[in-house]
Amino acid sequence: MLDAQQETYVEKISFILLNQPIAQCNASYNGLAHLKSQIRRFVNSQEKIKLLLPAFPCKTNNLDKVLSHTPDLGEYVVLRKFVQCIRDIESVYEPGVTFYIFSDYHTFSDYISVDLDHHYDYSDNLRKMVANMNCSDALKIVNFEHFDEFSDLKDTEYFDGLREKFGDPDYAENFTELKLKNNKMNQTYLGLKKFMNQDQKFVLAPLSYKDRRRRLADIAKGMMVQGKALDNFLQQKFADCIRLSIHEHPMIGKKYSLFLFHERQFKTPWHSTLLFDASRGEFIIDSKENHLKRSGVILPVTHDGKPWCYLQLSAADEVHAHALRQIRAELQHEKSGLYLECPVNRASLDMLLPKELSQLVKEFGSVLLRGFAPLADAEQLQTWYLNHRSAVTWAYEVNVQAFKGSTGEQPLHWELSCPPAYMAVHPHRYQYEDYTPHEYAVYSVASPDSNTWTVVDAALAVLTINGQEREQLRNTIMHYSNFSPEHGGNTLHPLVRYCSTSRQDVLRWQDFQHAQGYLTHLEGVSELTEQSRIYQRLNTLCHDPRVCFEYRLQTGDLLLVNNLTTLQASHTSSMHNEYWSIHLQPDSINSPWQPHNRIVEQAELTSA
């Protein structure tokens, strides 16, 4: 019998699983009750919650569907979704989770025509993605090689070994008869034939129509026979796990179906390609072939020298479309730090729509534009960038700020964390979302020497830490004071906050401990040793190369930054370096720069 606190754990864990990964297809009360009973058993013994998902075999050999044989943004997005679920469960249940992904490549290897080396390359890169999210201890990618039952076999023998050790001979021998008496089984068989006909079309192409039909029948039957053997193996070796599935099943307490992507369809990254539609600000999951048929300009994006995803941009006419197609697109990290480089002709920035660029900034944290025609002056930057949007107004009604040499240097921070006193951003009137710019632009006017901008993926930084630590940081408040004569101001910020725009937790920290004109201290943390420990932890977290990277700005570069999901620092080695910056006003009706609020502020100043 669980006590009240333990029952609360059960309810919270159930909610997280149902709200995030589990699809709840044809859900029944018994399915929910069984899920809770499984969770209750783990909680009662203070064990880790155990989840099992057979999936992630390898990329299909069909290059009409995918970019290559290695994992790409599709796999990363799904794994990041799993890590988010793990962190959320950790935050409410201290023992945490072990999430097993059992690669089923060897189960079906004789039917999918994918090289063994490609499978290992795929799995190794998946593990690298998980390691970059610091979650290898909780999200484990395993295979037959990790079990004693297969220790006497070579990896090329796992396929036959599975059937021999865990198969159902009666099921295989009586397959045709069983199929004719079981409609669900027959539907699965027909569905597999149809799917594999399309998936293996290049392998099947040399065969005659009759031989192709015979081969598809063998493949469908063989995959179902192997699937039965895999089920038997998993039931023995992972009997205590909550069983997840990439296929649709009624939620009756046996297998819990997952939507791998946010789209509520049963799609997998190893059979599809991701495209980011900049006009809509969302990912489209489809085949590579279909993406390339879309309207607009389709740009391939690489990461670490590998094909990664596509971008779709709009073009005003065919001249602009031709110029846009020359752009080289590359991501610094798996899902952050986008380079768009125009290699020839110094094309005008006018061919890029600022609103589409803002969607890219929102999704990828920062975008660097390089190789485009230079801007003549600050007014041209303002006109192009704003595009009927409004800018933050600084002292003397300035929208574009100019910095030269060391005046542009800043430690790790986010913009307007501690607004100047002249902005009259009073905490009783304005919330964080009201006055924090969601985006800003930096134009490198002159950069004869190194002009470095460090960008921290503040959402990924939070994702790399245990859920318990995340909540401790959320409940830790940092007090920032700016006592410089031209600024002034005081603010309070939690070290972790939920960003409603990106729907994720982000780190909010500024390394102003030794910055001139600033004082910082942690609210409610009186011990200097504890304050020092927290500062050191934050410093280590933010400078982890898995979450931060550098842009080395050249003359003419334009850097667009998501101020809500990143932290930024700038450093220059020359007094001759110069840049301009302009910040978009927050999308809040209660922004301090809204006309009705400026009228109130003017009235208050007059009465004072």
Q: What does each model-identified segment do?
A:
Residues 105-265:
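A substrate-binding/cap region within the structured catalytic cores of diverse enzymes
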Residues 300-551, 565-591, 596-608:
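Non-heme Fe(II) oxygenase catalytic core, chiefly the N-lobe of the double-stranded beta-helix
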